[in-house]
């Protein structure tokens, strides 16, 4: 199996090659390429399938004890500076490679049917392949410089894909919002990388951690600077993983095609932030203040995301806020030292959320013939209802994903979320309490989405065509994703913790030697499942059995309802303070430029013209006038000279 480690470089190169071939064809032979559109889709799918096979081989080797692989070449070398590029494969890398390639492959298979009538079909697959290549390159990066390069490529691709339907004003605005919001975090990340290099003289992850540890022992006063540098680095994941307060771009990103929403929310863009925090964990772990900040950022994000999801009527935005909340769990876990548990939840959530988004795309696809192609209609859950009768496979797979996200045993996310809550309870009880309440809200809003969409009666019966089950090309990926949604959690059970033995923080040993406490497990699992079931029960009473009037409840809690529906007014605050403030400053500077700067220049020009206009009368062509002027000039000069001499 050594051949797979020798072929690691093919994992990002294969999808990159497919995107380049299709992209060049689209630029040079547009009509021919469009005529062969399905062939280009097959090329992208085939390249991703090969990358997935190689990734599986790499993971197999890592599982069987092959040492981590580090291959680098010196790209820039001077007497005082050395920059290397290459790849680094360890258990974290090999796991992420499989997650990214498997989800991307299924998204591409799904997209082949979902996008087949779209005129931008080939362009979509070009962007999709570059997007996946960027994430694979980021995962393989051995140092912060290479990470930053691929980090920016991921951001660029998200801009292209969120704004894929750029003729829609909402899509164009959403892509700009995502791009600009992420630039804020990326600027902090760049400053943090440079600060860490200034302190340690290295961009390598392991070297930074070791050298920083030595520096903090030798020069304790550097701790403040180190904290600032690490917080700046953390700004990148805050934006990329949609953490408070830079989370505002994520719901708007739903303006892109649904397959892209699945990929962004499952295995690429938002996962990049969690991955970077995990890579930098040995550095952050030396600074308790930074770890506390990370833990509380994740906790607040999990809570805020859940509250915002409670009132959503758009199925994709409801799932988007769910992603924001679950990412908060992962960041909280990393901040509290639960490294293995956070990455386990990243993996289980990736498959469950990809399943949910692709199932939502199937619903939207089925609603389009009934209510039209406007997202305001075909994504509105209040226009749905009773779809389980028309789309049984979609409903079944969506229900599996919903139960998994809610933490219902024995589905995948139960094991990872329960492990996070158990670890957080031991070190940060307040964070645990907030996360525990969030688990209850998760059960409520996730089943609210399911009940509004699939249960009850169909609420858009306009005498037109009924929704139909999607084509096999879209349903098959849902069925395949249902398998890891059910089964992958078995890797991280406390009875046989395969995951923890394989993925743990660098320099730390797994906790296999700790004796399993069944009573403690049942207590923690019972509390998390219990609060989740309470949320599900309330949701059922309100949106399935209608025993509780949801409208009256929202009216009774009107202030809270408005607060959650308005997304805690955070977007409004940014719009008024930052956007409108920037515009006001720009308009003020424009007025200053036009009236002061331009006015001064124009006044000088006017004065010159006036002087010239006055002097032109002295050039009248009459000799006697010139003689008279000379006489007056001589007399005036003589008077000045006489006056000056008499004063001496």
UniProtKB/Swiss-Prot annotation:
Keywords: Chloroplast, Membrane, NAD, NADP, Plastid, Plastoquinone, Quinone, Thylakoid, Translocase, Transmembrane, Transmembrane helix, Transport
Enzyme Commission (EC) number: 7.1.1.-
Subcellular location: Plastid, Chloroplast thylakoid membrane
GO MF terms, alphabetically ordered: NADH dehydrogenase (ubiquinone) activity; quinone binding
Main location: plastid
Entry annotated with the keyword Metal-binding: no
Pfam families tied to this protein: Proton_antipo_C, Proton_antipo_M, Proton_antipo_N
Segments traversing the membrane: 7-27, 39-59, 89-109, 124-144, 147-167, 189-209, 215-235, 258-278, 289-309, 327-347, 354-374, 395-415, 432-452, 472-492, 518-538, 625-645
Domain of life: Eukaryota
Keyword Cell membrane belongs to the record: no
InterPro entries: NADH_UbQ_OxRdtase_chlpt_su5_C (IPR002128), NADHpl_OxRdtase_5_subgr (IPR018393), ND/Mrp_TM (IPR001750), NU5C-like (IPR003945), Proton_antipo_N (IPR001516)
Bilayer disposition of the protein: Multi-pass membrane protein
Any one cellular-component term (Gene Ontology): chloroplast thylakoid membrane
Cysteines paired by S-S bonds: none
GO BP annotations, alphabetical order: ATP synthesis coupled electron transport; electron transport coupled proton transport
Catalyzed reactions: a plastoquinone + NADH + (n+1) H(+)(in) = a plastoquinol + NAD(+) + n H(+)(out); a plastoquinone + NADPH + (n+1) H(+)(in) = a plastoquinol + NADP(+) + n H(+)(out)
Job description of the protein: NDH shuttles electrons from NAD(P)H:plastoquinone, via FMN and iron-sulfur (Fe-S) centers, to quinones in the photosynthetic chain and possibly in a chloroplast respiratory chain. The immediate electron acceptor for the enzyme in this species is believed to be plastoquinone. Couples the redox reaction to proton translocation, and thus conserves the redox energy in a proton gradient.
Family, per entry: Belongs to the complex I subunit 5 family.
Subunit architecture: NDH is composed of at least 16 different subunits, 5 of which are encoded in the nucleus.
Protein name (Swiss-Prot/TrEMBL): NAD(P)H-quinone oxidoreductase subunit 5, chloroplastic
Organism: Nephroselmis olivacea (Green alga)
Taxon lineage: Eukaryota, Viridiplantae, Chlorophyta, Nephroselmidophyceae, Nephroselmidales
GN (gene name): ndhF
């Amino acid at each position: 199996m050594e051949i797979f480690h020798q072929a690691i470089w093919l994992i990002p190169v294969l999808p990159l090659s497919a995107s380049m071939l299709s992209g060049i064809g689209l630029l040079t032979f547009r009509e021919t390429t469009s005529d062969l559109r399905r062939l280009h889709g097959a090329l992208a799918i085939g390249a991703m399938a090969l990358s997935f096979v190689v990734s599986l081989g790499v993971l197999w080797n890592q599982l069987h004890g092959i040492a981590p692989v580090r291959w680098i070449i010196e790209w820039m070398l001077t007497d005082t500076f050395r920059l290397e590029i290459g790849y680094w494969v360890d258990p974290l890398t090999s796991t992420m490679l499989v997650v990214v390639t498997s989800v991307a492959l299924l998204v591409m298979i799904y997209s082949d049917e979902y996008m087949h009538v779209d005129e931008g079909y080939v362009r979509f697959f070009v962007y999709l392949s570059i997007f996946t290549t960027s994430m694979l390159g980021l995962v393989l990066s051995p140092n912060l410089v290479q990470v930053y390069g691929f980090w920016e490529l991921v951001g660029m691709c998200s801009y292209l894909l969120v704004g894929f339907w750029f003729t829609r004003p909402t899509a164009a605005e959403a892509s700009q919002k995502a791009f600009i919001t992420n630039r804020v975090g990326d600027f902090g990340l760049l400053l943090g990388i440079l600060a860490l290099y200034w302190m340690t003289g290295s961009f390598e992850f392991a070297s930074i951690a070791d050298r920083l540890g030595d520096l903090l022992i030798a020069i304790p006063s550097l701790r403040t600077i180190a904290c600032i540098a690490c917080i700046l680095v953390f700004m990148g994941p805050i934006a990329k993983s949609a953490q408070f307060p830079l989370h505002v771009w994520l719901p708007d990103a739903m303006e892109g095609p649904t397959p892209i929403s699945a990929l962004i929310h499952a295995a690429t863009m938002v996962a990049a932030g969690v991955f970077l925090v995990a890579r930098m964990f040995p550095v952050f772990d030396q600074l308790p203040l930074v770890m506390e900040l990370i833990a509380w950022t994740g906790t607040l994000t999990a809570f805020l995301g859940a509250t915002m999801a409670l009132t959503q009527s758009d199925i994709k935005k409801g799932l988007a806020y769910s992603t924001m909340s679950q990412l908060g769990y992962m960041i909280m876990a990393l901040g509290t030292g639960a490294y293995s548990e956070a990455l386990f939840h990243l993996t289980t959530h990736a498959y469950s959320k990809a399943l949910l988004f692709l199932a939502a795309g199937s619903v939207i696809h089925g609603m389009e013939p009934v209510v039209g192609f406007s997202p305001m209609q075909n994504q509105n859950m209040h226009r749905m209802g009773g779809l389980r009768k028309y789309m049984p496979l979609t409903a079944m797979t969506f229900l599996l994903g919903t139960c998994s996200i809610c933490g219902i045993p024995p589905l995948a996310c139960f094991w990872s979320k329960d492990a996070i809550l158990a670890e957080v309870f031991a070190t940060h009880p307040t964070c645990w309490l907030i996360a525990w309440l969030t688990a209850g809200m998760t059960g409520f809003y996730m089943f609210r989405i399911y009940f509004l969409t699939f249960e009850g009666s169909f609420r858009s019966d306009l005498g037109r065509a009924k929704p139909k089950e999607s084509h096999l090309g879209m349903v098959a990926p849902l069925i395949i994703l249902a398998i890891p949604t059910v089964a992958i959690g078995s890797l991280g059970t406390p009875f046989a913790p395969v995951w923890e033995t394989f993925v743990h923080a660098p320099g730390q040993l797994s906790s296999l030697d700790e004796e399993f406490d069944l009573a403690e497990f049942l207590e923690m699992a019972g509390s998390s499942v219990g609060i989740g079931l309470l949320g599900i029960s309330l949701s059922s009473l309100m949106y399935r059995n209608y025993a509780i009037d949801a409208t009256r409840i929202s009216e009774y809690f009107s202030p809270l309802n408005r607060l959650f529906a308005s997304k805690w007014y955070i977007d409004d605050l940014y719009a008024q303070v930052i956007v409108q403030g920037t515009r006001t400053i720009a308009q003020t500077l424009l007025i200053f430029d036009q009236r002061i700067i331009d006015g001064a220049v124009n006044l000088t020009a006017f004065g010159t013209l006036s002087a010239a206009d006055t002097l032109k009368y002295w050039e009248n062509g009459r000799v006697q006038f010139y003689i008279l002027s000379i006489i007056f000039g001589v007399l005036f000069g003589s008077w000045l000279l006489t006056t000056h001499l008499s004063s001496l």
